Amino acid sequence: MKLQFNLKAYFKTSADPTPAKDAIAALFEEANSTLLTRGAPEGQGAKVTEWKLGEDRIELTLQSGRYVRVHDAIFRLRKQLAEALGKKYKIGIRGIEVESFIIKVPADHELRMLKVPYIKSMENIEGGIQLELEVGEAEMKNRVPDRILTLLEEKIEAAQYGAKAEHWNLLWQREPMEHPFKEDPTQAMMKEGWLKRGSSRGQWIHGPQSARIFRTFEKIVLEELLEPLGYREMIFPKLVTWEVWMKSGHAKGVYPEIYYVCPPQTRDPDYWEEVADYYKVTHEVPTKLIKEKIAEPIGGMCYAQCPPFWMYVAGETLPNEEIPVKVFDRSGTSHRYESGGIHGIERVDEFHRIEIVWIGTKEEVLKCAEELHDRYMHIFNDILDIEWRKARVTPWFMAQEGLLGLAEENTVGTTDYEACLPYRGPDGEWLEFQNVSINGDKYPKGFNVKLQSGDELWSGCSGVGLERWAAVFLAQKGLDPANWPEEFRNRVGEMPKGIRFL
């Protein structure tokens, strides 16, 4: 099956168009071979396949493929008809009414019904999917059918991608190591008083010992990677608005995983008095009442750490001599709503991360990524001395945004770093604890960032998740500093005492 559009519609006329029947017939015949083929390969333009006249209308059926789509074709015809009928016959075109709009899209996999505006019905048919749209003149002019088609094709491509096994490719793996420690590090840390659960799901309070480990990881990243490679520290916002996520592309699918932010409708104390009074009397927080008094979500808590940075450079032009731009942020927590039950520090809703971002030409971005890979290998082999591997994967946004072709070229994509967790057993699932992503022109285009020379800008990012580093290191080395690699132990120094309780 090929992509097919079928539109049944009519032009509303100011008078009976019958006197102009011959002129209309000639116009449609001519348009099928000229007007409706412009911009399309030979034989792939749109066509008027049927038409008839009514007292106050010109009814027609249009068919097309991917080129000169029917909703574009009908506006081309409107302009020609208005000129032809207006001059000679004094008949005006008052608007367009749509009777049916059907798109047939080739697909190898069935899809669930899309629950979005303007879709009247969706059916899985032999060889593809059939959509019936409920659109009018305004929606066609605003290219709503194109956006619906793009959404559907992205979902088809993502379904095909999900059926493949090739989106995880092993690049390198360290030789197997002996791991005497076999405990779950989270349980061991809790038992030794290194950390306790916070009051919110997926949240931990880190004691002095755990905090020392985190700060040592940060120091290693600063001294062994960020400073030698010339990265400058910034502070990124941790409340992210819809505007940012729309530009970054996250607005296409982030909703199940973010913590939403809703501001008060007003700061007027009188407006909130009944909430405060309710608590004073009942000693319960009236969450339903609060829900009535807060505004709609303005965005959410930091999810992926780098998008807010891009508002700093949005709409700007970078001088040639200023690239590559290399920055990092370690100023606060990120938040991600994790599914399932209770997890350890390897899977949390609130976590600490150093986010590394770089911008430059394609060649510069690829070079920066290689530099990071080299420094990470040094850290994981020579300082932490862990058993790990790295694999090339395709990130979620590419499957979601129809960018899989770029990933297959092996330039745009993500390299995941994974480590074994001995307590899970020899056949247990490895944990992804680090990544390096090359995002192509996704962010510079989304935030309208340009280069003085006019050359295309690319970007990359890499997140250092401190909880994941701790989960991996402590799972393999345990909590006893005597069993840690000497290089790491020297950087930690004397471990602080924990807080004692009776």
Swiss-Prot record:
The keyword Signal does not apply. Mg(2+) 1 binds at residues 336, 338. Zn(2+) binds at residues 306, 355, 461. Changing residue 461 to A: Loss of activity. Keywords: Aminoacyl-tRNA synthetase, ATP-binding, Cytoplasm, Ligase, Magnesium, Metal-binding, Nucleotide-binding, Protein biosynthesis, Zinc. GO terms for cellular component: cytoplasm. It catalyses: tRNA(Ser) + L-serine + ATP = L-seryl-tRNA(Ser) + AMP + diphosphate + H(+); tRNA(Sec) + L-serine + ATP = L-seryl-tRNA(Sec) + AMP + diphosphate + H(+). Inhibited by serinamide, unlike type-1 M.barkeri SerRS. ATP binds at residues 336-338, 347-348, 432, 468. It is found in: Cytoplasm. Changing residue 306 to A: Loss of activity. One of its GO terms (biological process) is selenocysteine biosynthetic process. Mg(2+) 2 binds at residues 416, 432, 435. InterPro entries: aa-tRNA-synth_II, aa-tRNA-synth_II/BPL/LPL, Ser-tRNA-ligase_2_arc, SerS_tRNA-bd. Its EC number is 6.1.1.11. Pathway: Aminoacyl-tRNA biosynthesis; selenocysteinyl-tRNA(Sec) biosynthesis; L-seryl-tRNA(Sec) from L-serine and tRNA(Sec): step 1/1. Pfam families: tRNA_bind_4. Its cofactor is Zn(2+); Mg(2+). Binds 1 Zn(2+) ion per subunit. This ion is coordinated with 2 cysteines, 1 glutamate and a water molecule that dissociates from the zinc ion to allow the coordination of the amino group of the serine substrate, which is essential for catalysis. Binds 2 magnesium ions per subunit. One ion coordinates the alpha and beta phosphates of ATP, and the other coordinates the beta and gamma phosphates. Belongs to the class-II aminoacyl-tRNA synthetase family. Type-2 seryl-tRNA synthetase subfamily. Consists of two distinct domains, a catalytic core and a N-terminal extension that is presumably involved in tRNA binding. NCBIfam families: PRK00960.1. Homodimer. This is Type-2 serine--tRNA ligase.
